[in-house]
Amino acid sequence: FRGEKALPALRLEKPAAGILLFGAMALMLIQLPLINATAAFNSNMHLPASLEGLENLLRTMETSAAEVTEAFLQMHGLGDFLLMLFIVAVLPAFGEELLFRSTLQPLMIRLVRNPHLGIWITAFLFSFIHFQFFGFIPRFLIGGFLGYLFYFSKNSWFPVAAHFANNGIAVTASWLISTGYLSDSPDNLGIGVNAWWQCLLSLVLLIAGMYWFRKQSKGIA
């Protein structure tokens, strides 16, 4: 009985429309240049001189975390790739979205009585809980994007799919680079002196895509 009520409560009971599901994933990938640009900006931020010791500690922690992640993503076969895709993309997509978007976000919206404020408070908590100061801004923005996917559709499958696409592209790119099929990382999109047009195009497509998603979602929410 409890299990039967769990799916409706988490907004997973309704099958997601195929075109919208792929649209949510595409929107996640479309904003890669913007996310990478904000990540580069965030990583170059500095704390006040009085907090230099804290900044050095935070940077050391994030460098160590990046090294662990890089070592973790060393894949030596298709089996390793599929396992990493499950661990890094599938599990976090379901776990984090069901916690933050399906459960916490509606509570925040009811608490503050403002959907937009509730979405961004949830996005703040989503980014904060990762404990990566120099990656806070891009993760905060991603959290807001995922929040609006859920708010517009009232269906958890869309933020889950977008979250999977975000993490999955990192695993897939790492796999393709290691096998020689890809020469450059998607993390470099939107970075560099001539990358402004990538960010501008990314922003325009994201705004248009979210307008389309909101309009199409009205028929299923």
Q: Regions from the language model: what does each represent?
A:
Residues 1-3, 80-108, 205-216:
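Transmembrane alpha-helical segments in integral membrane proteins
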Residues 7-91:
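Juxtamembrane helix-loop-helix connectors linking adjacent transmembrane helices
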Residues 88, 92, 115-130:
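Small-polar-interrupted transmembrane alpha-helices in polytopic inner-membrane proteins
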Residues 95-121, 151-154:
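Membrane-interface helix/loop boundary segments of multi-pass membrane proteins
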Residues 127-131, 135-189:
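Functionally important transmembrane alpha-helices
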